[in-house]
UniProtKB/Swiss-Prot annotation:
Gene Ontology terms: cellular component: cytosol
Organism: Mycobacterium leprae (strain TN)
Family annotation (InterPro entries): AlgH-like (IPR003774)
Pfam families named in the record: DUF179 (PF02622)
Family membership: Belongs to the UPF0301 (AlgH) family.
Residue runs in coiled coils: none
Protein name: UPF0301 protein ML0028
Gene3D superfamilies registered for this protein in UniProt: VC0467-like
């Protein structure tokens, strides 16, 4: 259940996390729309213009090598393109996890998002990026909300706002990231991780 603050503009979620770049949106158990069911969305931008994020747990069958071969070596396994959301499926967006201690300042093609996460310009030179990152993920499309739209969905309990770990962005194809994120939360939230993937079994 979402905590209701006194100021409706300062909406927060169960872990008292404000929506901002670097947080996660976790689909609540009642959100059954196929595009976002059990989705984990990493917020890349959140400002007065709206909110932009990418779904972390929707791998495609398209190999990175077949689309952007120059980046295949740096792509985390599985080395496939991930479906970031329903908006602009003809565009690609890349996130990378910096190595501990790496400094992206002044490096052409890198833009800091939050913590150890950076956005990578896919026109940049991979050899310049490689020494700085543990791995990267390339997304086709993204998830977007206009001003106030995401606020309404959170108030409707469609989403849970939680902290992200750098490893969330590079999680493997076989991992159930939705359940993993919930299991590391306090007791009441962690219990949601047992919610069946097939709701007919509930």
């Amino acid at each position: 259940m979402v905590i209701r603050p006194e100021d409706p503009e300062d909406y927060v979620a169960p872990a008292a996390q404000r929506v901002r770049a670097g947080t996660l949106l976790l689909a609540n158990t009642d959100l059954l729309e196929p595009t976002f069911r059990r989705s984990v969305i990493y917020i890349v931008e959140h400002n007065e213009g709206g909110t932009l994020g990418v779904v972390l747990n929707r791998p495609s069958e398209t190999a990175v090598y077949n689309v952007l071969p120059q980046w295949a070596k740096l792509a985390a396994k599985p080395k496939t393109m991930f479906i970031g959301g329903p908006v602009k499926r003809d565009a690609a967006l890349c996130l990378a996890v910096l190595r501990i201690g790496a400094d992206p300042d002044g490096v052409a093609g890198l833009r800091h998002v939050a913590g150890r996460l950076v956005m990578v310009d896919l026109d940049a030179e991979p050899d310049l990026i490689a020494p700085l990152v543990d791995g990267l993920r390339i997304f086709v499309g993204y998830s977007g909300w206009t001003i106030g739209q995401l606020k309404g969905e959170i108030e409707r309990d469609d989403w849970i706002v939680l902290s992200a770990l750098p490893s969330d962005v590079l999680v493997g194809k076989r991992a159930d990231l939705w359940a993993q994120v919930l299991r590391r939360q306090p007791l009441l939230l962690s219990l949601l991780a047992t919610h069946p993937i097939d709701v007919s079994r509930n």
